[in-house]
């Protein structure tokens, strides 16, 4: 079973919550799912995982894998790997990321890899998230918003994936609300303009318990298409 890279059209589109929800729902389908966030950044937590996002993923997937495999590199400032490298003099370790991914892949049937920022977030000079996905040799799922402007961002993200020959499993629309693009119209337009299937849309989630995530994702996401 192929692992999947959960990519976003931008930062803060909800990649962590989508990855967590997918992990919970797939586990309920008896898929042995592992999780990974190659790069994380921000203020380190005092207890548990350094990254809150990584902790959310590990709890959702109910894994006890070492932190250095789930999150091989953490930067203590909110910045891209490239900017963190320039500011902190800590170079992103792509070889370590790829090695950790291979090790995790031997421990689980499938790995959900959460990206960082958008698809062209820089890791090194002339090396972006797209390059990393390409080296991992896995397909992607694109997480996008429902707000006005999302069509532009989603099309650009998909075109970059296509340029790098990254297979796309589908699009997930996250956190839809009444003030955004009407979901039915957005789904129609995205599929018509990109030729990529919209796997579903997720409303704002207040209850992040595994039971709640499973219920919401089972109801709203085409999980069978995701696993094809």
UniProtKB/Swiss-Prot annotation:
GO BP term, example: biotin biosynthetic process
Binding site for Mg(2+): 16, 53, 114
The keyword tRNA-binding is annotated on this UniProt entry: no
Essential cofactor(s): Mg(2+)
EC number, as in UniProt: 6.3.3.3
Binding annotation for ATP: 12-17, 53, 114-117, 174-175, 203-205, 210
InterPro entries the record matches: DTB_synth_BioD, P-loop_NTPase
Pathway(s) annotated for this protein in UniProt: Cofactor biosynthesis; biotin biosynthesis; biotin from 7,8-diaminononanoate: step 1/2
Gene Ontology molecular functions: ATP binding; dethiobiotin synthase activity; magnesium ion binding
Catalysed reactions, as listed in the record: (7R,8S)-7,8-diammoniononanoate + CO2 + ATP = (4R,5S)-dethiobiotin + ADP + phosphate + 3 H(+)
Active-site positions on this chain: 37
Short name of one Pfam family: AAA_26
Entry's family note: Belongs to the dethiobiotin synthetase family.
The protein's role, per its UniProt record: Catalyzes a mechanistically unusual reaction, the ATP-dependent insertion of CO2 between the N7 and N8 nitrogen atoms of 7,8-diaminopelargonic acid (DAPA, also called 7,8-diammoniononanoate) to form a ureido ring.
Full protein name: ATP-dependent dethiobiotin synthetase BioD
